[in-house]
């Protein structure tokens, strides 16, 4: 039976107090406390197994039997309403109403917090905030639930305001903020809060450390990452597998493969994720042969490669032109490990063929893919058309596919425009430029960053936002002058920086 019909049928019972229940039903209720426990136990078991509709039916039968639910009953059901989407919103509202009738939403901190959590997970923050403000007593879990909900939905300012109002901030509060900043792309803020957390005397756990390392990875903040690594060693987190995996990702992203190698070899225990980190990371850094060595060692150690592992192996083959070996790995993945190829695997093969100049093979693969090729796959082949023989005919076909996919990337138009220009077809090049202008496509400005005293300074072309812009320009002019005195020609890029 579906959830909503159950709720619709039993809603009168859900708001019936036990003192007004049917006397005939009440006679069956010989031991209310024991019966409440048994009913709640069944409801909790059903909810934990994802059977929310059956749990709702059980709750309906419980109320019809004249048995009053306790706080554990409400917490179990409210948790289910937050975790499952199909039809649970109406049940959540009814449970909230029933809890209000019993006064549990205001006077029982655990029930009130569960209601807040349910509304937050469903994105109903106005309702969650009303319940929060109405509660007489709040504990740290209540505050943290609101903060976590705000951060999950990207309401960073509201989360920060809630954090500032907290009477006491604990580890979970700080971690929710730091983790939320990372997930929503506020990497620099995450690192600032991580430092503030330590200054405040709260010792980070492995979850907060991983969040900080992820922020360092996304920013390329190697110095701060090294500092976090030293902290990890001093606080005996070095045997935490997840922390070590994050360190490997950080060092590979920053190009420090030797540091990544050291972390990997010092691990007492490794998981598939650990092996994937070095295989993918080394492949991305041009250490393709070593990446494939790790791929073989992984299997020798008894670890079963997964889809991510094969993405790393195929990437490695692509970077060093091992076409036949890459095709062999693709077959091993499908036949030996029964892994259904994803679009990223096909993308690796297209890149493998394209880098080797085998454009016809790459095109045949794209046409035979079981799924619709995306802009990454077609864009890879388009770039290869420029690099291998300036194949304008194929490039035009690929550009039509990208247009059909509604892909509006300036880089694809630039590639085709340059191909026309290289072939002396100036009208075609001009047409591509006009299309770019008509679509409002502009080249995304590149940026560079430098880390000084654990602070990231990011610079973009034409950006004057940095507080030291004037001083930076003066220093850049001095460097350019010295270069000219030494007989060096200042590149256009340097001139652009000065004139930006």
UniProtKB/Swiss-Prot annotation:
GO cellular component terms, A-Z: chloroplast
KW Glycoprotein (keyword) present: no
Record-level GO BP terms: RNA modification
Coiled-coil residue spans: none
Keywords noted in UniProt: Chloroplast, Plastid, Repeat, Transit peptide
Molecular function per GO: RNA binding
Highest taxon above the source species: Eukaryota
Region ranges (Type E(+) motif): 454-484
Annotated region (Type E motif), positions in chain: 377-453
Transit peptide per record: 1-54
Subcellular location as annotated: Plastid, Chloroplast
Entry keyword Repeat: yes
PROSITE patterns assigned to the protein according to its UniProt record, in alphabetical order: PPR (PS51375)
PPR repeats: 35-69, 70-106, 108-138, 139-173, 174-204, 205-239, 240-270, 271-305, 306-336, 342-376
UniProt-recorded name of the protein: Pentatricopeptide repeat-containing protein At1g05750, chloroplastic
